[in-house]
Amino acid sequence: MKGKIKMSTLKCKMCGGTLEINENETTATCEYCGTEQTIPKITDDVVGNLFNRANTLRLKSEFDKAEEIYNKIVGLDNTQSEAYWGIILCKYGIEYVEDPTTYKRVPTCHRTSYDAITADEDYKLAIQYADISQKIIYEAVAKAIDEIQKGILTISQNEKPYDVFICYKETDESGKRTQDSVLANDIYHQLTQEGFKVFYAAITLEDKLGQEYEPYI
């Protein structure tokens, strides 16, 4: 019977929770968000810490900084499929959001490319060095990302531009609504009444899932 090991440096790519891993396995399911995902080969603490740092940065949408660390991992071990996959997630600005209907984590793209993810050299290297279990997940996620990208490009081409973009902070550090958000709401209604097309996230995106709202921004 395989024992489970907890590696404090290995975090969930979707929610950041600590993963409980079966020894010698290359995929794991997060006990916090329930997402099955690929995991890297951890040969030592240095590699584990690098993956953790890169993942933390990506979860904070600091994609360029995260990509630098994934490239550093590749420099240490060019057979790390997860490092190449991490680079892909950064190139496309992937963030995982919770679907309010299914409660599953789904990808949303903060960056757009006209090229298919499957044509990317880093994707090809991730597939090359992945085992069967990892390939299945990589290919499924890549397909989902490609569909999102197509949707983004379609919306971007067809959506009429906004006259005004209202940017504000919704909540403060304690989670309470900010005064700015109240003011933003008033400004939105005032400008809308005056005939302007206004982008105001709280209303413009209220019926959009995370993976769908990025094109409008």
Regions found by a protein language model. Give the residues of each.
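Residues immediately within or flanking Cys/His clusters that coordinate Zn2+
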Residues: 9, 27
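Short cysteine-rich clusters marking metal-coordination/redox-active sites
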Residues: 12-15, 30-33
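Cys/His-rich microdomains that often coordinate metals
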Residues: 16-19, 37
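Short Cys/His-rich micro-motifs in 6-15 aa windows
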Residues: 34-43
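Short coil/linker segments at helix-helix boundaries
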Residues: 43, 47, 93-140
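Alpha-helical segment of the N-proximal tetratricopeptide repeat
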Residues: 45-72, 76
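Short, charge-rich amphipathic alpha-helical segments embedded
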Residues: 68-102
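Conserved N-terminal substructure of TIR/SEFIR domains
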Residues: 143-217
